[in-house]
Amino acid sequence: MHTVCLLPLLFFTIGGCLGSSRPFRTFVVTDTTLTHLAVHRVTGEVFVGAVNRVFKLASNLTELRAHVTGPIEDNARCYPPPSMRVCSHRLVPVDNVNKLLLIDYAARRLVACGSIWQGICQFLRLDDLFKLGEPHHRKEHYLSGAQEPDSMAGVIVEQGQGPSKLFVGTAVDGKSEYFPTLSSRKLIDDEDSGDMFSLVYQDEFVSSQIKIPSDTLSLYPAFDIYYIYGFVSASFVYFLTLQLDTQQTLLDTAGEKFFTSKIVRMCAGDSEFYSYVEFPIGCSWRGVEYRLVQSAHLAKPGLLLAQALGVPADEDVLFTIFSQGQKNRANPPRQTILCLFTLSSINAHIRRRIQSCYRGEGTLALPWLLNKELPCINTPMQINGNFCGLVLNQPLGGLHVIEGLPLLADSTDGMASVAAYTYHQHSVVFIGTRSGNLKKVRVDGSQDAQLYETVSVVQGTPILRDLLFSPDHRHIYLLSEKQVSQLPVETCEQYLSCAACLGSGDPHCGWCVLQHRCCREGACPGASAPHGFAEELNKCIQVRVRPNNVSVTSSGVQLTVAMRNVPDLSLGVSCSFEEVTESEAILLPSGELRCPSPSLQELQTLTRGHGATHTVRLQLLSMETGVRFAGVDFVFYNCSALQSCMSCVGSPYPCHWCKYRHVCTSHPHECSFQEGRVHSPEGCPEILPRGDLLIPVGVMQPLTLRAKNLPQPQSGQKNYECVVRVQGRQHRVPAVRFNSSSVQCQNASYFYEGDEFGDTELDFSVVWDGDFPIDKPPSFRALLYKCWAQRPSCGLCLKADPRFNCGWCISEHRCQLRVHCPAPKSNWMHPSQKGARCSHPRITQIHPLTGPKEGGTRVTIVGENLGLTSREVGLRVAGVRCNSIPTEYVSAERIVCEMEESLVPSPPPGPAELCVGDCSADFRTQSQQLYSFVTPTLDRVSPTRGPASGGTRLTISGTSLDAGSRVTVIIRDGECQFVRRDAEAIVCISPISTLGPSQAPIILAIDHANISSTGVIYTYTQDPTVTHLEPTWSIINGSTSITVSGTHLLTVQEPRVRAKYRGIETTNTCQVINDTAMLCKAPGIFLGHPQPRAQGEHPDEFGFLLDHVQAARSLNRSSFTYYPDPSFEPLGPSGVLDVKPGSHVVLKGKNLIPAAAGSSRLNYTVLIGGQPCALTVSDTQLLCDSPSQTGRQPVMVLVGGLEFWLGTLHITADRALTLPAMVGLAAGGGLLLLAITVVLVAYKRKTQDADRTLKRLQLQMDNLESRVALECKEAFAELQTDINELTNHMDGVQIPFLDYRTYAVRVLFPGIEAHPVLKELDTPPNVEKALRLFGQLLHSRAFLLTFIHTLEAQSSFSMRDRGTVASLTMVALQSRLDYATGLLKQLLADLIEKNLESKNHPKLLLRRTESVAEKMLTNWFTFLLHKFLKECAGEPLFLLYCAIKQQMEKGPIDAITGEARYSLSEDKLIRQQIDYKTLTLHCVCPESEGSAQVPVKVLNCDSITQAKDKLLDTVYKGIPYSQRPKAEDMDLEWRQGRMARIILQDEDITTKIECDWKRINSLAHYQVTDGSLVALVPKQVSAYNMANSFTFTRSLSRYESLLRAASSPDSLRSRAPMLTPDQEAGTKLWHLVKNHDHADHREGDRGSKMVSEIYLTRLLATKGTLQKFVDDLFETVFSTAHRGSALPLAIKYMFDFLDEQADQRQISDPDVRHTWKSNCLPLRFWVNVIKNPQFVFDIHKNSITDACLSVVAQTFMDSCSTSEHRLGKDSPSNKLLYAKDIPNYKSWVERYYRDIAKMASISDQDMDAYLVEQSRLHANDFNVLSALSELYFYVTKYRQEILTSLDRDASCRKHKLRQKLEQIITLVSSSS
């Protein structure tokens, strides 16, 4: 069932300058995607097409009906669809995407066309969506199987009395032979009629359709026509299309696809399509072309627009949206434009084109359809506007683009859909955008298009193409992928003033005056009265009031209100001030109003706390409507709030300053006497500006200030004072007023603490009468300064501000005033003195200290007393002149100079030498540092390659690269952006390559030196691309994993993934796995609103930062979705939850499973007391098993970078038993134990024989199995959680299947990864010719049989040789598997005959590989069962491998012996109690330090290598083993704090040695704690490591021969333990158990012929845990139809062959036939694959996993055996382990063989066809010449024997095969 929810009120905010919000209705879906919309033109009902659904909604968007259309079993390659004919391709449920939704009004039905079954349509009844019909049995019923929902357009043309016609255009997705791109079809009344959708006209030459020619698709495979919009105007049908611009695409060197827009026109009554014309169409604005049509709408122009265009008002016009340029059709640029076309203009262009063609001018110009240029034929005739074509001069293409009239451009939102209608005299256009907005545009002329409103509808989600009006045009319906929205066409009520209303530009809106609201004219009660409804801005009411301000001390002032544009007010008006006061107004004869100002009491309420002025609104209230309909601002002013004379008299209101009272008043008579009143700024007392007031510290002096209008203190008033505030302290100094223009602060000195500043600003003011300040100008400053502060040297002193008058006191060596220096005439130096210069210059530093001898280096010299001007300083550096740069000179402190070239061949180092003025001793100095000339060199660049777009961080290595002052790195002709440098390396960012992928030289420019090296070349490669993301969603917080597929990813150094949402960009880290894959953590996004939508948020941009590759910054086709973050409820109100040990804990939450498509899920980790628990996840809760510990344990949930602390679990065990109960139980138990003991003793004496011992053993096994059932159940549940988590992240491709080639080579040539058959053979021409002749000879059955039999007859032809020859033969015959199969059958028949002749038991046939035929049989199955492995059997085998690996790694595994706590193999079982703890380490991902840490479970007893393997397994989960780093290539780094980092190793100087035993290090050895932070870093080779590595290599060499003979090819790692004891060094390594202990224990164990109970318990527990996975694998292998896969033909064919051979030889024993089949398939193929899953998957198999798989393989073999399964006390434990299961498995095998025997036989012809197809699929996987060369080795070795055999065989003699072989031998010999 579908899930939809109706949200009748969903608020949004309009953009631009508007800020109100209005509700609108929506219809939202969550489990489908909406594609199309239709609105009934009468009823207003809304029909919505979607993926797998069609909805019917009421006009208010209430859901009325829903009709299900899919998913349907289908396959895109099935034609006709599977409903009509059985399809050979696999059928799967396919979504039905609605591509066309039309209302057939004449037949009262809905036409809904989808994508399934090659694009069939359904007819639905309008009333209830009942399916009236679904024609699908004729080819005309299939419109197109293309999946794009918006590539089809249709128009229904009603024909009065006759049936309607459907004109439909569609993309055909390359299948032009099946579907016409444009056609005219019949709409029959009977929906099931065979004639439904038949072409309107069709004969053998002409039909009413257009098809894309196959020649066009051959030339341009991507060619297609996408139909955007269709409509009818007058007697014509039009379509707007997008199609490939073949000319532009052909000319583009970069391979870009270009598209062009065209308008297609045909006569509606033209059944032969003779009238077909298409014209390019587009728009241009400011010189930029817009050629990608997005949407269009046919409408009538408003009167104003029609007049501006000069067309009639009933003329059709076409509003069209175009995107900029011609590229990126699927995700076009956001630069878009709204354009206008008149149909009369389009038709005129078409008419002129037809007329010119009928005059014989030019060609038909339609290359995509005609594939050649056909000339127009001169045919004189009258062509008018309704001409519908003839059989000639058609179809016709336009030569020039029909240009539209640009109306509105947009570069941000991306306009995507358009609708328009006429309101009054205006054309109103509505535009949907890709950012989810609705734009409203008023178009009144070609230059008069005004965007007047933008409404946010579905922010960040594109509005789709269908944009439709309700029948009354009061609402508009918008469609997005998840939502239908109904918006009113206007929301006038949002405008709250007349100016806002009439200035908005919305033509629907006017101002209802007495109602004081914005609305349509029809909604205004008094609209018909004069001035009752305003529609123009100058018609708004204008109000003025006289006076417009009043003092707060005045009341009852009569105010006169004048008004314009007011309606009749005779029913009365009242005046109000902010609802505080209201009074009735008097209407004067002049039309003015008279109102009183508020009373004093009301004024206090209005103005209290508002300072000097308060503006209030004087409002007019209509007695007729009770509404305040107009208003004007009115000011109340308060002079007394102004505190200074200047602010008082500068006020715009009548305020006066009382000078002697120091107050401001609105009443001048309040001043005490006349001369104290000031009413202008010129009369204010004020300190006059005179520059800064400079005050030296510690100098006793008066301060005289100029002023004006200084008042004379009167009797009783205090005198003047100067108030100085410095460092928080206030000083008052008496002052004297000399006159009204002068005041002097008396003698005083001033100080400030500290010498950190040379001067400080004072807060300085002049006051009188205690606290009356004199006004100061804003620029007035008082500075207090110290000469000596921050001026310790002469040079610094002389460069001080000259206004301070500071100078250098020579004898005091101090900067001070002249008055403080003794004998200043000769002892005090000031810059004003002529020739003043400081002696004893000193250089403290020079930089740089090295530079090229070519010069150009800018040397910076820092010191003191380095002159006062650059002109007086002379410089030489290392004996070379250095020219001062005046602009860089800092007086006395710093000189920057540029070195000249040194002319000395090898100049020595030298100091910098400086003279000030002259070079006498006192004015000369040199530096202690020496400057050296060097010759920089360039050695190499790393990396050596990077993307052509640049952005790669390059490290350029060499010598002396830090020399000089400036460095520029040039790569070909672009500058590499400098980052940093040192002596050995320069780091810079590569520029873009102007030549694309190519090699570029590198040149270093260091100052004036240019350095290059011919051997240092940087290679620009193809830019990396991103092709696929999995999954395409995250949560708002991000930090979930994304697997990214692409190309050239290894060229990127620091990839990051980015998202941009609402203008805010976020990034996260990526880790490159290989050239085509990387793992990223999704970036989070910041929401502007508190709650994200359930259906998800789409970022504005989503892409990748791949160096400077711009194309990846925003993925064109990305539909990345962010779903709400999960949230959790706390554990009860108190945050504490009481539970019992082991019971389930339910954690409730929301959004736990995002509503995303696909199988990907969030990864949750629940920690209880720091320990993870097994989880079951649903949408609203996590089900978690609490751990067995007790007490209070905190609960934390981790997901996607989020951490949730939910509270505390209080885990309490049941109360202990009471003492009497315990005594009673103990006594009862003792008696019971005694009774059992007596019985067992008696029983033992009576049961001595072996059978009874067996039964007792079996009984013990059963009892033990029951006893460990609970343990098994718990272990299985935990493992099941792990496996479920694993399978949740596995999606077909994520099972790391090896490719066919690698798989085949691993089985055919085990242990040889790089076999010669995988490589090209480099050989002389003669030898190559000979090998090709040898290959032809192998295709002679007589020769090949003789060749193989001869080799087998040789005593030196070893078992290994037999296998090699069999494999090489199969490879050589890979392209002829039919021939190879016949040969194999003959060899098997010969082998059976030989077996029977030698009197061997028939059951021994195929048991061992003693012949070439047996190995060939294995290889034959290997080739032919590969598909079955990938599609069916591979998954359970992979899950079994994963289950074994995970179960083994949950307990300790000995790194030396390979023994484990959990094992299926008795030989690999640890027989001691090992104490261990589980740790969770937080691992920093390799190569991506900034990414999120990964929690990894390890054991504290794990060796370091074991821990590294577990870390790598987790960090690189899902990555094939060959594509990830290896443990031996990485170091494990334990990070403790910011700086402490410890490298952990299996052996180091801390390794413990006791006697001659050395214990390898574990995590416990290093005391690594739970929760530790670790990192995997590239291997650091130290002297110790190198020595260790050498010792280790020597140790391994002793095992090499043994390992090479092993069946597993997975290198040394699969069989060898991780570490090998170094016996040569005299010490033995051990990990968990010592070898001798283990040996002793085993000896005793085998002596008793039994495994002790504790060890057997572990075997049983492991077996029980893995039981389901073993069962699944066996069930899959022994089933004839499993998981939807049929039995492979090869099995049935070979089993039938064996039955035939048995029949021919009269072998009737069913056990023999059973055994032959078991030896043939399970033993030869399946056992090999089960024991060696690395043959099938890209994985690593360690020794303990290998041992367990061997037990499973043995059980598999036992299940196929026909012999009785006898067990005894000497039986191995693994047979005892599966004793109860094997009978059941045997029944499966017997049933499997029976079912195969019952199947219909496969004919040789059918089998040959199958084998030929298999040969074709893999014909080029191996190099046949290499295989022939390897095979020819045996010809050389046994040359004489083979030639003799060829002579003896009659058939060989007949065909002269000996001579042919000798010819080959001669050819080979001649080249040696």
Swiss-Prot record:
- What is the membrane topology listed in the Swiss-Prot or TrEMBL record? Single-pass type I membrane protein
Q: Which residues form the signal peptide?
A: 1-19
Cellular compartments per GO CC? plasma membrane; semaphorin receptor complex
Instruction: State the superkingdom.
Output: Eukaryota
Q: Where in the cell is it found?
A: Cell membrane
What positions does the record give for glycosylation?
A: 60, 549, 1163
Residue ranges of every copy of the Sema domain listed in the record: 20-489
Q: Which GO terms describe its biological process?
A: axon extension involved in axon guidance; axon guidance; branchiomotor neuron axon guidance; facial nerve structural organization; gonadotrophin-releasing hormone neuronal migration to the hypothalamus; hippocampus development; motor neuron axon guidance; negative chemotaxis
Which residue ranges does UniProt annotate as crossing the membrane?
Answer: 1221-1241
UniProt entry keywords in alphabetical sequence? Cell membrane, Coiled coil, Disulfide bond, Glycoprotein, Membrane, Phosphoprotein, Receptor, Repeat, Signal, Transmembrane, Transmembrane helix
**Coiled-coil annotated residue ranges, if any:** 1240-1294
The organism named in the record is Rattus norvegicus
Question: Listed disulfide bonds for this chain?
Answer: 78-87, 113-121, 267-388, 283-339, 357-376, 492-509, 498-540, 501-518, 512-524, 575-595
Q: Which GO terms describe its molecular function?
A: semaphorin receptor activity
Entry's family note: Belongs to the plexin family.
Q: What is this protein called?
A: Plexin-A3
UniProt keyword DNA repair, yes or no: no
Summary of the function given for this chain in its UniProt record: Coreceptor for SEMA3A and SEMA3F. Necessary for signaling by class 3 semaphorins and subsequent remodeling of the cytoskeleton. Plays a role in axon guidance in the developing nervous system. Regulates the migration of sympathetic neurons, but not of neural crest precursors. Required for normal dendrite spine morphology in pyramidal neurons. May play a role in regulating semaphorin-mediated programmed cell death in the developing nervous system. Class 3 semaphorins bind to a complex composed of a neuropilin and a plexin.
Q: Which residues lie on this side of the membrane: Extracellular?
A: 20-1220
> Which gene carries the instructions for this protein?
Plxna3
